[in-house]
Amino acid sequence: MNKFDEFIESNEKDLDVDTSTRNSIISMSPVRKTGRKIRSASSNGYRLEHHRTSSAGSMHSQRLMTPTRLNDQDHPLQAKPDARRVVTRHSSVSVPNAMSKRRSLIQPMVVPTTPESQNNLPSVSHSEGSYGIPLESTTVLSSEQAMASGLRRSRNGSSQSVNSMIATTIPTNGVDVSALLQSLATKELELLECKQKIEDLKKQTQHEEQNYTRRARELHELKEQVSKHLDPSLNTPVKNRAFSPVYQNIPLESRTENAGNSSLPSSVSKPKNMGHQSTNQSRSVSPQDIQERRQRDDSSDSSKQSLWSKPLALFNQFDKIIQHEIERTLNWDDSLSGTPEVQEGTPTSNSESSAQQYDNEAPGARQKSPSQGSVSRSLWSFVSDVKAGLLGIEEENDNDVITDNRCDPVYKSDRQHEQKKSTHKITNRGQAEDSGDDSSLNNEEI
């Protein structure tokens, strides 16, 4: 043993203090070296093994965590002869009271004990534990007494409740009035609740109908807006449709055809333009467009017959003019029979241009050879006829009546001038035939 250990032990004995609990360990191996067991003399009753080892030895040890009892006399709760007996009330006394309250509605089936039997029961019971330690009861009433008191109270409570029920349920003529009144009140409440539910459902249906009508109106407005965005011509009036982008995309020829002022070449291209318009406008169709199309179809049906008859008449005129000019160039026809045919085959435009050309020609040009004059005149008349047919000077629509009336005096004056010239030529030819001069005939032909 070291001097340090001896010094500690001597101080512990003098001060009556045990400081070995901080380093108390218990051996886990069977091999033990020199050591010393110290039994505490204090009143705490714990067994402590204080084992000290040298620095040279190695030893597996474990700290003692649980106290151990040494004997019955060292127990801290042991009753001493000079100590005063203290009786305390245990907390388990309130448990039977709670149990009695819970069992108050149940009628007891066990007969409670009498006070005589309660006096015979011991008030305090002593028992010894398995370890020889005397266990003192700290309760004033035992569990049997608590149960008996609880049963007695529950019996009293149940009897009182039965008496109260009997007093309140006194039958009157064999009918329970309170039960009837209660059922009547419940039925009235149920009826009121049903009426309230019906009114709520009616209000809800009205509200839903209003929402439905409002949403249907909004849907109709949205459809109109979408149709206006897709077809902007519906927004503009009829007068301003000429400036709309849809109307600007339509060719000028188709516009004149729809308006009634159509020429011959535009009439030929009308079916194609109508097909393009139908494909472009097939995406957005409205009742107004359908009515307008029907009106246009009805108005155009009458003009289609005359439009298709013009090309045939024009081709016939070209054929006659070409045939007549070829015959004149080859001198196959007579001079007398040729001039009326030319006047009958050519249109008014040809006669007008020939008359103007005849008046404007210089005197020296009239003295040319008859063959050159006839060829040039025939060529100029052919060009003027083709030009007049391509430009569509002849107008047959009702919208151009005013222009036709304005042009009638001019045509009349030209025709009168032509008739005067023809009569003058015929008189000259008659005189020449009578005289037998051929040179005058050639000059007249020129």
From Swiss-Prot:
Q: Give residues where Phosphoserine occurs.
A: S244, S286
UniProt keyword annotation of Cytoplasm present: yes
Question: Coiled-coil segments, which residues?
Answer: 179-231
Show the Pfam families listed in the entry: TDA11
Start and end residues of each stretch annotated as Disordered: 32-62, 252-306, 332-377, 392-446
List the subcellular locations: Cytoplasm
Key word Phosphoprotein present: yes
Q: Which UniProt keywords apply?
A: Coiled coil, Cytoplasm, Phosphoprotein
- Name the record gives this protein: Topoisomerase I damage affected protein 11
**Could you tell me which species this protein originates from?**
Saccharomyces cerevisiae (strain AWRI796) (Baker's yeast)
Upper classification of the source organism reads: Eukaryota, Fungi, Dikarya, Ascomycota, Saccharomycotina
